[in-house]
């Protein structure tokens, strides 16, 4: 990583900030520190939980961070800059599940992409067209505006209620299997 081909710098000259996931075992943290100090000879290392740094970025030190990645979602309560590990909640529903749910909805609407990159296309649609509804029950009764999405092959598809139905999975895991 620190070679002339990559960062073009020397690890001995630069302190490192390493982020870690909530509930990361102490053993993993110790092993990472060992590698950075003994292999890369870094002068300093600061390890912090991603959620704490996210909260700091908002200018706050107390709050609850909802951190949803590709495979897991954490709710992390933080008080005066310190995560409260016994109160951290984890659920194995996250972005990948929303993408799968959106793919299911799109298939029900007649869209099947017949491509080896189908999942990447659906993920891109999710990232560009989906949104969280403030009141999904109300939006279900309304004639929601359809969004046009341009596919990589130049064709377009129209996405309606699937735009807010798929992300609702994050708040209603019971939707899995419906």
Question: Could you tell me what each predicted segment is?
Answer:
Residues 1-178:
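C-terminal region/appendage detector
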């Amino acid at each position: 990583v620190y070679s002339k081909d990559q960062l073009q710098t020397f690890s001995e000259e630069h302190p490192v900030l390493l982020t870690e996931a909530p509930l990361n075992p102490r053993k993993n943290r110790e092993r990472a520190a060992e590698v950075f100090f003994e292999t890369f000879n870094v002068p300093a290392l600061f390890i912090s939980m991603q959620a704490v740094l996210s909260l700091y970025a908002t200018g706050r030190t107390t709050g609850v961070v909802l951190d949803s990645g590709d495979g897991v979602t954490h709710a992390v309560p933080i008080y005066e800059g310190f995560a409260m590990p016994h109160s951290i909640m984890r659920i194995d529903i996250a972005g990948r599940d929303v993408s799968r749910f959106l793919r299911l909805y799109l298939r029900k609407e007649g869209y099947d992409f017949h491509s080896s990159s189908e999942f990447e296309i659906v993920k891109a649609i999710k990232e560009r067209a989906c949104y969280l509804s403030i009141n999904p029950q109300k939006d279900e009764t309304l004639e929601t505006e359809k969004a046009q999405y341009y596919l990589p092959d130049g064709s377009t598809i129209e996405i309606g209620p699937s735009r807010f139905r798929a992300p609702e999975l994050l708040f209603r895991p019971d939707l899995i299997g419906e």
